[in-house]
Amino acid sequence: LCADGPACLAAEPLARRLGTTKGSFYWHFKDVPAYHAALVRQWHAQALADVMTQLEADGASAARLRSFGHRIINTPSEAALRVWAQSNASVAVSIAEVDAERLTYLQSLLNGFGLRNPAFSHAILASLIGLPQMHTGTDQHAAFDALVDTVLALA
């Protein structure tokens, strides 16, 4: 998905890439939509588990905020899934659910700094979605940290 986009998520390209047969693919999955559903379920579960891990983490809120952002930036499948979601409604629904949880988590962190305006959490999440889409040679972690510094300076 990351290298070749959603078109590579069909039985034949997957079998070719893995050096196996289409029959092997169909042994594991009823059909291509079932494979897609399993792939999205796995990402969804992992993304929500990451939010829960951050919720349960110890440490200063600023460090937790940075860690949360860096984990998203470091997930290459995130950007690829968002591209896929533009043409696949079930992927879009899954991403929207994860984004809602992420916004709730971000807002809870920002509330701790006295920043109650939900636009801040939306701006932070938007930067996490957009930074990996940029191909300018920008240090994405440094750019995210600069945004966090700016938002926290308002507290």
Outline where the language-model segments fall.
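Helix-turn-helix
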Residues: C2-A34, A38
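Residue-level recognition of oxygen-bearing side chains
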Residues: D31-A34, A60, S90
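Hydrophobic alpha-helical connector segments
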Residues: A38, A49-A80, F120, I124
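Short, basic, alpha-helical segments at the C-terminal edge of helix-turn-helix-like DNA-binding modules
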Residues: R41-A47
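Amphipathic alpha-helical packing segments from all-alpha helical-bundle domains
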Residues: L48, N74-A80, A89-H122
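Acidic, metal/ion-handling microdomains and their immediate structural contexts
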Residues: A85-Q86
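Hydrophobic/aromatic-rich alpha-helical bundle segments in the mid-to-C-terminal region
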Residues: A92-A96, N111-A155
